[in-house]
Amino acid sequence: MNIRPLHDRVIVKRVEAERTTASGIVIPDSAGEKPDQGEVLAVGPGKRDDNGKQIALDVKVGDRVLFGKYAGQAVKVDGQEVLVMREEDIMGVLVA
């Protein structure tokens, strides 16, 4: 992927959630909501504090993260749709 995020921006690829209910009903794409979790593809260097010191991000490439329904800006890079969001839009990291 040819994109390098700036400051506290994070590039996230949506990860599709399970499309079948517990009772076996398949949910069509048109009826389901967009997934609210994804995989971090790239991270920026971090933002700067009031003294100019750079603050590193908590998330790293490969993390599986949770984010809000309306978080980030969808863009296409190399034909692939990804989200560009601030680290503060990420609610948490899923731990296996």
Swiss-Prot record:
Cited InterPro entries: Chaperonin_GroES (IPR020818), Chaperonin_GroES_sf (IPR037124), Chaprnonin_Cpn10_CS (IPR018369), GroES-like_sf (IPR011032)
Name of protein: Co-chaperonin GroES
Provenance organism: Dechloromonas aromatica (strain RCB)
Localisation per UniProt entry: Cytoplasm
Keyword Chaperone: yes
Any one biological process term the GO annotation gives: chaperone cofactor-dependent protein refolding
Keyword Aminoacyl-tRNA synthetase: no
Keywords attached to this entry: Chaperone, Cytoplasm
Database matches in SMART domains: Cpn10
GO cellular component: cytoplasm
UniProt subunit comment: Heptamer of 7 subunits arranged in a ring. Interacts with the chaperonin GroEL.
Similarity comment: Belongs to the GroES chaperonin family.
Pfam families the UniProt entry points to: Cpn10
Functional note: Together with the chaperonin GroEL, plays an essential role in assisting protein folding. The GroEL-GroES system forms a nano-cage that allows encapsulation of the non-native substrate proteins and provides a physical environment optimized to promote and accelerate protein folding. GroES binds to the apical surface of the GroEL ring, thereby capping the opening of the GroEL channel.
Molecular function via GO: ATP binding; metal ion binding; protein folding chaperone; protein-folding chaperone binding; unfolded protein binding
